[in-house]
C-alpha cells in the first residue's frame, strides 16, 4: 500500500514538473522557491525549539550543571556558547530566539514576493501565448471557436491554471514546516509523536470526500464561466438587434439563468472548503486535550515539555489544515488547468501555414505602398504605422 502511494506521488510530481516547464516555470525557479521555503521553516522551527531550553533555564534558575544533568540538549548548547566565548544567560537565549523569528520573517517575505513575481510572469506568458496563437490560427479554428471562450480563458482560467501550478510548491512549504515541527516532537517524546500521528490521520480522513467533490464543482464552474463569456460577447456586440427583435426579456432571462448557475457553483465550492477548514480543528483539539490529561496523570511528563507540545500542536493544526486546503484547491482548479492545456494544444495545432509566399528575385518596376493605415474604433493609434508587411 505504501509503495503504491509512493508511486502515485512520484508520478504526480513528475507530471507536475513537465507541465510546469511547459508553462514556463524553470527548474531554477522551483529550486529557489524550495530553498527559501526551507530556510524560513528551519529558522521558525529552531526559534520555537529555543523555548524548551529557555523554560528549562528558568526552572533550574540558570544552574548549568543541573541543566546538563537533566537534558542532553544542554550539552550541545554549552558547547555552542563556549565556541563563541559567550556565557549562558536568559537574555542571550531570548535574543537568539527573537533573531531566529526575525530571520524567518525575512525569508517568508522574500518567498512571498518571489511567488508573486513568478505567478504574474507565468500568467502574462500564457495570455500572450493564447492571443498570439489565436491571431496566427487558421480560419477554420476561428470559425469553430467562440470568441467568448477565448476571452474566458485569457481573463479567468489562465489565473486559475497558474495558481494550480504554483500550489504544489506552496504545499511543499507546509510539508517542510510539518516535517520540521514533527522532528521537534520526536525529540520531545515518542509518545507525543505517535499520538500526534494518530490525531492528524483521523482529522485528515474527515474531508476526503469533500476534497474529491471539489474537482467536479471546479469543472462545472469553468463551464459556467465559459457560457457567461460566450453569451456576453454575442449579445453586447449587437444590443440594437436584441431591441429590434423584441427579445429583451428572453435574453435577460437566459443571462440570469447563467449567472445563477455560476453563483451556485461558486457557493458549492466555498461550502466544501469551509467544511474542510472548520471541522478538522475540533477533532485535533479534543484529542490533544485527552492526551494532555494522560500525559500529566500517567506519563508524568515535565510541565515545560507539555507546554511546548501544546504550542507545537497549535502550530501544526493550521499547517495540516493548509495542506488539505491546498490539495482541495488543486482539485478545484483542475478544470482551469485542463482547459488551458487543451486550448494551447488546439491553438498550436491550428497555426496557419503560409504556403502562398513566393520570393521575388528582382523587380523591373518599383512597388510603393503609401498612406496605408488602420485605426480601431475609438483609438487614434495607427496600428499599421510600424508594419512593413502588407
Region locations from a protein language model:
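Cytoplasmic juxtamembrane "membrane-exit" helices immediately C-terminal to transmembrane segments
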Residues: 113-121, 125, 187, 205-227, ...
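Hydrophobic transmembrane alpha-helices
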Residues: 99, 103, 232, 309-322, ...
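A hydrophobic transmembrane-helix motif
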Residues: 103, 169-211, 267-313, 367
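Cytosolic ends of transmembrane helices, especially the final helix of ABC transmembrane type-1 domains
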Residues: 240-243, 247, 271, 316-343
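Short intracellular "coupling" helices and adjacent cytoplasmic loop segments at the cytosolic face
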Residues: 3-6, 62, 119-120, 128-158, ...
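Primarily ABC-family ATPase nucleotide-binding module
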Residues: 344-390
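Juxtamembrane loop-to-helix connectors within ABC transporter transmembrane domains
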Residues: 22, 115, 135-181, 237, ...
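Membrane-integrated ABC transporters
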Residues: 1-49, 59-97, 103, 110-115, ...
Amino acid at each position: 500500500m505504501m509503495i503504491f502511494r509512493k508511486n502515485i506521488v512520484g508520478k504526480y510530481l513528475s507530471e507536475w514538473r513537465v507541465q510546469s516547464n511547459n508553462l514556463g516555470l524553470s527548474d531554477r525557479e522551483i529550486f529557489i522557491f524550495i530553498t527559501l521555503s526551507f530556510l524560513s521553516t528551519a529558522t521558525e522551527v529552531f526559534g520555537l525549539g529555543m523555548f524548551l531550553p529557555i523554560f528549562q533555564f528558568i526552572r533550574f534558575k540558570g544552574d548549568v550543571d543541573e541543566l546538563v544533568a537533566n537534558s542532553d540538549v544542554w550539552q550541545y548548547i554549552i558547547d555552542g556558547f563556549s565556541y563563541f566565548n559567550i556565557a549562558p544567560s536568559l537574555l542571550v537565549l531570548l535574543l537568539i530566539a527573537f533573531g531566529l523569528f526575525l530571520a524567518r520573517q525575512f525569508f517568508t517575505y522574500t518567498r512571498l514576493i518571489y511567488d508573486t513575481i513568478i505567478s504574474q510572469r507565468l500568467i502574462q506568458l500564457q495570455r500572450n501565448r493564447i492571443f498570439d496563437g489565436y491571431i496566427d490560427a487558421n480560419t477554420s479554428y476561428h470559425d469553430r471557436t467562440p470568441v467568448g471562450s477565448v476571452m474566458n480563458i485569457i481573463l479567468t482560467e489562465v489565473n486559475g491554471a497558474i495558481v494550480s501550478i504554483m500550489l504544489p510548491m506552496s504545499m511543499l512549504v507546509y510539508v517542510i514546516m510539518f516535517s520540521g515541527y514533527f522532528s521537534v516532537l520526536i525529540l520531545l517524546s515518542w509518545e507525543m509523536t505517535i499520538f500526534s500521528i494518530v490525531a492528524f490521520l483521523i482529522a485528515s480522513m474527515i474531508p476526503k470526500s469533500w476534497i474529491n467533490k471539489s474537482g467536479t464543482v471546479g469543472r462545472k464552474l469553468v463551464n459556467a464561466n465559459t457560457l457567461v463569456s460566450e453569451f456576453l460577447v454575442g449579445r453586447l456586440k449587437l444590443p440594437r438587434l436584441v431591441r429590434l427583435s423584441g427579445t429583451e426579456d428572453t435574453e435577460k432571462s437566459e443571462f440570469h439563468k447563467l449567472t445563477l448557475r455560476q453563483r451556485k457553483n461558486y457557493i458549492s465550492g466555498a461550502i466544501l472548503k469551509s467544511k474542510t477548514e472548520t471541522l478538522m480543528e475540533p477533532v485535533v483539539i479534543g484529542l490533544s486535550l485527552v492526551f494532555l490529561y494522560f500525559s500529566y496523570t500517567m506519563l508524568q511528563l515535565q510541565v515545560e515539555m507539555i507546554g511546548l507540545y501544546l504550542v507545537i500542536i497549535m502550530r501544526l493544526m493550521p499547517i495540516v489544515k493548509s495542506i488539505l486546503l491546498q490539495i482541495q484547491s488543486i482539485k478545484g482548479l483542475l478544470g482551469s488547468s485542463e482547459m488551458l492545456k487543451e486550448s494551447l494544444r488546439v491553438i498550436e495545432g491550428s497555426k496557419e501555414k503560409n504556403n502562398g509566399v513566393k520570393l521575388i528575385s528582382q523587380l523591373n518596376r518599383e512597388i510603393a505602398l503609401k498612406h496605408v493605415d488602420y485605426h480601431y474604433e475609438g483609438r487614434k493609434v495607427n496600428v499599421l504605422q510600424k508594419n512593413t508587411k502588407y
